[in-house]
């Protein structure tokens, strides 16, 4: 992630930090989210040759809203079984698959996220990132509860 942080410095983003080797960054910028996404996508392609990288930028308020939007009854679940599939496009429409068709796993669609609960583990669920992308018709990236919580802590620091 050192190279990614150097890129952020070169682009004049402030206070850039990465979380582990997850590809997640927390930074300060005057750019709007969509502009930040396109700038990073272009620069990553130019500098590192990764033309198919999709960047998803959320504000502190946006990340807080995602966590706060977790279905209320899910707050009783084991947090290690909760995942957040962040969506590239806000307002993506969910397809026709019913959450009950995948029990004991379940999902709920939010504004820019699909919440996934998989009591038998993410490695065993059919509600993986590919499923979410087919369901919503947009790119997604999935993070577990622990990573999402740590990102919010980094943003709040």
Where are these regions (language model features)?
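Surface-exposed, charge/polar-rich loops and edge strands
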Residues: 1-157
């Amino acid at each position: 992630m050192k190279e990614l942080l150097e890129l952020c410095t070169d682009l004049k983003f402030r206070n850039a930090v990465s979380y582990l080797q997850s590809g997640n960054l927390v930074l300060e910028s005057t750019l709007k989210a969509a502009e930040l996404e396109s700038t990073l996508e272009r620069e990553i392609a130019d500098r590192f040759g990764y033309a198919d990288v999709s960047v998803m930028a959320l504000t502190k308020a946006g990340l807080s809203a995602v966590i706060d939007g977790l279905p209320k009854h899910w707050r009783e679940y084991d947090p290690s079984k909760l995942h957040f599939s962040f969506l590239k496009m806000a307002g993506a429409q969910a397809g026709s698959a019913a959450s009950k068709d995948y029990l004991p796993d379940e999902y709920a669609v939010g504004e820019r996220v699909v919440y996934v609960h998989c009591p038998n583990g993410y490695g065993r669920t059919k509600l993986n990132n590919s499923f979410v992308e087919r369901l919503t018709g947009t790119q997604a990236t999935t993070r577990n509860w622990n990573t999402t919580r740590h990102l919010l802590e980094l943003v709040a620091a």
